[in-house]
């Protein structure tokens, strides 16, 4: 019984206020785009950070299966260490602390959540049409050094969303909220005032 991105989006919408501003990072951005697809009239503004509007590539799906097998065998720590490779993050003084935070979060959530989220990511739908239809203030933000969801994906989203703002965070990879929190928060503040 797999949970889909659509299921996750519907669950969050059911627990959310009638109107709200929405921010999504990485998989959270994928869920945020689906929330926009399901209930655009409820979302006052949207910010998409280090995310991907496209379906998962076959080669990425193929890489996930050995990870899922390893996690089922009790090797979540190994998979996270290998998957979170430091190259997801920019080189910088916060790198080790950010990696530790990510590892702690993964271990706290546990293998079932990793497996559920992996399946949801594998089965996600293309959101380019959703992006073209967005008509609220939109911030698209990414770390310049993000190799998981590269700048080119964010440039595509910026082209698709009319009147969007694209902010590129220097000295940050996939997690600018943790790698460069001050700069990221400044972008968020500007977007919230818009």
What are these regions (language model features)?
Residues 24-28, 32:
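Gly/Ala-rich beta-loop-alpha elbow adjacent to hydrolase catalytic centers
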Residues 163-194:
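Catalytic active-site module of serine/aspartate enzymes centered on a nucleophile-bearing elbow/loop
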Residues 134, 140-142, 146:
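Short beta-strand/loop motif that positions the catalytic acidic residue
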Residues 1-23, 38, 186:
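Active-site loop/oxyanion-hole signature of alpha/beta-hydrolase fold enzymes
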Residues 21, 44-47, 132:
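Residue in the alpha/beta-hydrolase core beta-strand immediately N-terminal to the catalytic nucleophile
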């Amino acid at each position: 019984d797999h949970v889909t991105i659509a299921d996750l989006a519907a669950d969050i919408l059911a627990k959310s206020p009638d109107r709200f501003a929405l921010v999504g990072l990485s998989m959270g951005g994928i869920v945020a785009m689906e929330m926009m697809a399901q209930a655009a009239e409820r979302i006052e503004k949207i910010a998409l950070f280090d995310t991907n509007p496209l379906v998962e590539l076959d080669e990425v799906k193929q890489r996930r299966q050995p990870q899922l097998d390893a996690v089922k065998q009790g090797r979540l720590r190994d998979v996270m260490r290998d998957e979170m490779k430091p190259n997801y993050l920019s080189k910088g003084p916060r790198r080790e602390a950010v990696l530790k935070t990510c590892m702690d979060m993964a271990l706290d959530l546990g293998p079932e959540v990793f497996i559920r989220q992996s399946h949801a990511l594998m089965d996600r739908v293309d959101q380019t049409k959703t992006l073209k239809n967005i008509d609220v203030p939109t911030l698209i933000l990414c770390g310049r050094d993000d190799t998981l969801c590269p700048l080119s994906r964010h440039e595509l989203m910026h082209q698709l969303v009319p009147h969007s703002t694209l902010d590129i965070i220097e000295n940050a990879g996939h997690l600018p909220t943790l790698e460069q929190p001050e700069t990221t928060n400044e972008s968020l503040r500007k977007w919230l005032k818009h």
